[in-house]
Amino acid sequence: MKKYLALALIAPLLISCSTTKKGDTYNEAWVKDTNGFDILMGQFAHNIENIWGFKEVVIAGPKDYVKYTDQYQTRSHINFDDGTITIETIAGTEPAAHLRRAIIKTLLMGDDPSSVDLYSDVDDITISKEPFLYGQVVDNTGQPIRWEGRASNFADYLLKNRLKSRSNGLRIIYSVTINMVPNHLDKRAHKYLGMVRQASRKYGVDESLILAIMQTESSFNPYAVSRSDALGLMQVVQNTAGKDVFRSQGKSGTPSRSFLFDPASNIDTGTAYLAMLNNVYLGGIDNPTSRRYAVITAYNGGAGSVLRVFSNDKIQAANIINTMTPGDVYQTLTTRHPSAESRRYLYKVNTAQKSYRRR
C-alpha cells in the first residue's frame, strides 16, 4: 500500500532535493544545517505536491523504494513488503515513453544506494550488469530479467497489456504495476547471507537474529531510509547506534551516509550494535533468552527504555529481570513497554527469528 504522507511527515526524510549533479546533492554539512534542511524540505515537498497533488505524495521509506525523475513527473515505487513495483507518470506528452524508460531502468538498476539520491529528480539510476531485482521479477514469459533487450520487450508488453490511468482531479496519472515473484523476500535475503555470516562470526551474534532484524527493519531493502534518518538494511542511525559502534572501535565521529548505505558496512555496524547491547548495555541480564528479548526491544527503542520498564535504576532493573522467567520478560516487554512500536517490534523480530532458525 502506498504511503500518502502529510508534509509534516516529509521533513525528517529529506536529504537532498537538488536537481543538479549528484556531487552537489550530498553535501552533508549543508544537510545538517537547519536552515539548509528547511530549504531542501520545502523544495522537495513543493515539487511533489504541486505536480502530483497532496494525496499523491509518495516518498521513500524503510520498505519502500521511491525514485522521481523527469522533473518529478515520473516515479518508480517498489514496495518490498507487498512485493509490487509501480511505475507512474503524470507527463502530459508521450507518457508511454516516460513509463517505458522508467520500467527498464528500475528493472535493471544496481544495488548501490549510495549512488542514488531518492530525494531529487536527478536521473542517477544506472543500468547494471547485475540488476538488484534479478530473480525477484520475471517477464511475461516467466524469465528473469538481466539484459536491456529483455527488459525493453517486457516494458512494451506491460504498456500494451497492463497500462492503467486515473485522475488526481487535475491531471491523468498513467501507471503500470509489476508483481514480484512469491519468494522475493528470500531472494533478497540470499544476497546478503555471506555478509551476515561474516558479521555473525566477528561479533558472536546469531545469524538468525541478524536476518530477523533485517527483515523487520527493511525487508532487505538496501535503499531503506526512515523518518528518524535510519539508513540501510539494518536501519542504523548515524548519531546514535552508528556513533556508539564507531566509539567502541576506536573511531572518531559518526559513520557517513555512504558508509551505511553500503550493505556490508551496514550489516557489520548493525551487528556490532547488537553485540554492544548484548554484552555491554544489557550484559547484566543472566538468562540468554531474556537478554535476547531485551536486546531486540532495545535495538528499536534503546536499552534505557527497556530497563525502565522494570525499574528506573538500571542495576535494579537487571536484578528484577533475573528473577523472572523468559516468558514473563517477553510478556512484560510486549505489554508494558511505553512504545507501541517497540512492543510490536519484539513480536515481529522474535517471530521472524523462529522462521530463520528452522531453515
From Swiss-Prot:
Which keywords does this chain's UniProt record carry? Cell outer membrane, Cell wall biogenesis/degradation, Lipoprotein, Lyase, Membrane, Palmitate, Signal
- For whether the record's keyword set contains Lyase, the answer is yes
Highest classification ranks of the organism: Bacteria, Pseudomonadati, Pseudomonadota, Gammaproteobacteria, Enterobacterales
Primary enzyme class = lyase
Q: What does this protein do?
A: Murein-degrading enzyme. May play a role in recycling of muropeptides during cell elongation and/or cell division.
Keyword flag NADP:
no
Origin organism is Shigella flexneri serotype 5b (strain 8401)
Quote the protein name from its UniProt record. Membrane-bound lytic murein transglycosylase C
Annotated gene: mltC
User: Which superkingdom, per the lineage?
Assistant: Bacteria
**GO: which molecular function terms?**
hydrolase activity, acting on glycosyl bonds; peptidoglycan lytic transglycosylase activity
GO BP annotations listed: cell wall macromolecule catabolic process; cell wall organization; peptidoglycan metabolic process
- Signal sequence coordinates: 1-16
Provide a GO CC annotation, any one.
cell outer membrane
